[in-house]
Amino acid sequence: MLELNNKKNIAILFSGGVESTLLYYLTLKQTSSETNIKLFIIDRDNNPIERAFDLYNKLKILWNDTRTSLHILLIPETIPSHKKISNALNILNQEHDCVILGLNKYPSKKSIRPKLKGNTFNNTSILKMLNKFENLILPFIDLQKNQIIQMYYDYDIKEILQMTHSCGSPELKPCKICFNCRERIWAYNKLDKPLELGV
């Protein structure tokens, strides 16, 4: 899935969510011990930093990981939330062989998607913006959340799902009403598996 041959200096944008946690696992498994892997987190409206560090520290022990590190990537507060990712990519793209981002397709069910959004990124302003980063890897760009959750079962790491954080609100527990929670509920329903909303 990840084509990381000859990549010696890898950055992963990490939030502690379903996609970025799986990318952490896959990158660890598909690279050699000489590969330098750094995970970066940016602060957002749902305050992910504390949860992401908590998850990372647990996984580092569970996966016997001695190769990675997690860093807070400081983005100026003057930059609006919807531009923070592109700002982070600008910084990381200059310093790494590749940057891995867990962007995935929106659900096929229209009522779940954010208003006026299709379920692919073809010919969208987001994809045009991302295409300018030559070192960017988007392994999940054509996959929906249910397909990504299924990979946790395929790789026999499904117990990690309960430790991930998807909720887009700053609440202490998953709110169940934001897009991120509704997408996760939709994905589990589609897979016909018991719902695990995470932390």
Question: Where are the model-predicted features located?
Answer:
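Nucleotide-activated chemistry modules centered on ATP-dependent adenylation/adenylyltransferase
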Residues: 1-199
